[in-house]
Curated annotation (Swiss-Prot):
Annotated lipid attachment (S-palmitoyl cysteine): C233, C236
Top-level taxonomy: Viruses, Riboviria, Pararnavirae, Artverviricota, Revtraviricetes
Molecular function, one GO term: G protein activity
Protein name in the entry: Transforming protein p29
Keywords: GTP-binding, Host cell membrane, Host membrane, Hydrolase, Lipoprotein, Membrane, Methylation, Nucleotide-binding, Oncogene, Palmitate, Prenylation
Gene3D superfamilies according to UniProt: P-loop containing nucleotide triphosphate hydrolases
Transmembrane segments: none
Annotated localization: Host cell membrane
Length: 241
């Protein structure tokens, strides 16, 4: 008779079903799937060779408790989590198709805790675009957006950094930040504004995909600088999904 498979040790930790992939070394995922935490062969039939895909490095920033991790996990796994340990730094990957382009999203979900503020410079240096998230029922988190934006600009040494302002928890009652306030702030920054619900998935894909489009436009601007003698063309696209 074949030998029975050994039972796992009693003290062996259970795998968290929504545990993120940890940076830095990550295998490439199959289409539309989060990369596995450990090895394994790549699934056949990829829409495009991994080497041919454009990779976009996205960073999610915002105050503690605004739903940064919930937004990211909803995008990656189509699942809402309302209880999880406070994030310090988690990395996720997903292959998607945006406007006909197969691309790989490398998403860094960051902490909003002040004691880790010094770590932000490091991950902001590598990020290409930033989701600046606040909760529509938390005025302080909205006020904190200015601080995050200024830190991003300082670290990137540029006023032209791809960003999207995200008002999360739009499914909840008790709104304290009106849509018009957020739209006005986004307009003053020259960036899009999108309202989301990590619980219902409303606006989640739109927020991340819009950021990818902002990164593409930023790259085009660097390749083809606008005529400095003409009027500026920075515009704000506010999307209330």
């Amino acid at each position: 008779m074949p030998a029975a498979r050994a039972a796992p040790a009693a003290d062996e930790p259970m795998r968290d079903p929504v545990a993120p992939v940890r940076a830095p070394a990550l295998p490439r995922p199959a289409p539309g799937a989060v990369a596995p935490a450990s090895g394994g062969a790549r699934a056949p039939g990829l829409a495009a060779p991994v080497e041919a895909m454009t990779e976009y490095k996205l960073v999610v920033v915002g105050a503690r408790g605004v739903g940064k991790s919930a937004l990211t996990i909803q995008l990656i796994q189509n699942h809402f989590v309302d209880e999880y340990d406070p994030t310090i730094e988690d990395s996720y990957r997903k292959q998607v198709v945006i406007d006909g382009e197969t691309c790989l999203l490398d998403i860094l979900d960051t902490t909003g805790q002040e004691e880790y503020s010094a770590m932000r410079d490091q991950y902001m240096r590598t990020g290409e675009g930033f989701l600046c998230v606040f909760a529509i029922n938390n005025t302080k988190s909205f006020e904190d957006i200015h601080q995050y934006r200024e830190q991003i600009k300082r670290v990137k040494d540029s006023d032209d950094v791809p960003m999207v302002l995200v008002g999360n928890k739009c499914d909840l009652a008790g709104r304290t930040v009106e849509s018009r306030q957020a739209q006005d702030l986004a307009r003053s920054y020259g960036i899009p504004y999108i309202e989301t619900s990590a619980k219902t998935r409303q606006g989640v894909e739109d927020a991340f995909y819009t950021l990818v489009r902002e990164i593409r436009q930023h790259k085009l601007r660097k390749l083809n600088p606008p005529d400095e003698s003409g009027p500026g063309c920075m515009s704000c696209k506010c999307v209330l999904s």
